[in-house]
A protein has these predicted regions:
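Aromatic-residue-lined binding/catalytic grooves and analogous aromatic/hydrophobic interfacial grooves
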Residues: 1-265
């Protein structure tokens, strides 16, 4: 641990095998599945400057500002607390394109779970309507869906076997992306992957409101350690870490049981 002396720490139990497997069930995901990457269609990182990004723990919103090729970008991103849904509002002087990229899982342990050189081992299909679309993903025996809706003048197209582009024709794009494994809610045929009914999902404004209300409740109804009167100069940093840890707990451990250790960020 780079402290200049040996230190002892506990390891997970390895024997007997049944006990080890029970520990692994809570500790590790046997087949990590990367559901997708959503990002701006900006290919040259060297053209990006004046980066200013911060996470507002009080509302759960990530606010990002930067310039790309001398064009300004402002991106606001939130997550709906009750759905597997993210929502983003983008304003820019330049071109606005959002890429949905999908990779095959690696099955590894200490990587990002993405194998980008195995396009033929999985498949992505797109069905679009006015201001909405359903992306159907097939990976081995796994089938899941991403429902996308947007506001503004934009079009969505498939640019590769496992790549989708949502391109705005204006200076603003607001969209939501809902990940869903149960096709019944979408009215999707399990065999064809074709949707018969595209439902409404919350837009950016509604997601931002739900996120803000959820985090307000989390911070005002819970408690935390106040180190404001502690004279030790390390108190401020310790308090910052406590608050950040509580945020991560609220964001990642809201289920009935703790998530697998290898699934944490």
């Amino acid at each position: 641990f780079h402290r200049g002396h040996p230190e002892y720490y506990s390891l997970q139990i390895k024997q007997p095998e049944r006990t080890r497997k029970a520990v692994d069930y809570l500790r590790a995901n046997p087949h990590r599945l990367h559901l997708g990457t959503i990002g701006l269609d900006l290919s040259d990182a060297s053209k990006m400057n004046d980066i200013d990004q911060h996470l507002d723990l009080w509302t759960g919103k990530i606010d990002s500002k930067f310039t790309y090729d001398k064009q300004t970008y402002h991106i606001e991103t939130v997550c709906d607390p009750g759905l597997d849904c993210i929502a983003t509002n983008i304003t820019s002087d330049g071109n606005i394109g959002v890429v949905f990229s999908f990779a095959y899982p690696t099955g590894g342990h200490c990587d990002d779970a993405c194998r980008w050189d195995a396009d033929k081992l999985h498949n992505t299909t797109l069905k679009s309507e006015k201001n909405s679309a359903v992306i159907t993903r097939t990976i081995d025996n796994t089938l899941y869906y991403i429902y996308v809706s947007w506001k503004g003048n934009a079009e969505i197209i498939q640019t590769g076997r496992n790549k989708i582009l949502l391109k705005s024709k204006g200076k603003n794009l607001s969209f939501s992306a809902l990940f869903q494994s149960n096709s019944d809610e979408f009215g999707i045929s399990e065999k064809s992957g074709i949707t018969t009914k595209i439902p409404q999902i919350p837009d950016y404004t509604l997601c931002a409101k739900a996120s803000s209300e959820r985090w307000y409740s989390y911070w005002t109804e819970g408690g935390f350690i106040d180190l404001g009167n502690v004279k030790d100069k390390r108190a401020t940093e310790l308090e910052r870490r406590i608050i950040l840890s509580q945020y991560l707990m609220g964001a990642q451990e809201a289920g009935n049981i703790p998530p697998q250790e290898t699934g944490l960020t």
